């Protein structure tokens, strides 16, 4: 049993512990937000123009654009108004192949955060900004509490996620998760400093 003389001291300790818990919770939330933000930012967005199947078409279209631009460099090809003379411009291109209705950004919008269990869901909504992933993750991280959560998972469950992590995309040749994991401790240090300095 504690004496009443110790109550103020114990209350001060409890206040410190509660304050420290709140700081840690906020630092963990901020760290999670930094990790998720980096994963989303590094996530490639499908660009059919750079797909292997479209390399010939893309190269041809670029050559046509460059040819037309070169024509403009010769003053003999221009009218008095500075426009390209009729009949000189090449009006040709090859179609870029893509699945019907394809819009890039599905992978970027499929990052999920889970507390103590790995998320299993996916969605079919393209979002090249990644705002959907960030919003969902923030909502999960907001409920993080010290002592109630042992693990935080960052997951992208699309079937091609592993291929992208293994460098399948020129936009993210080193993947996303491995590189972000290397910086996780630094993100925590930054977040802890922000919390302690009231930023």
What does each model-found stretch correspond to?
Residues 1-199:
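Short, Lys/Arg-rich flexible segments
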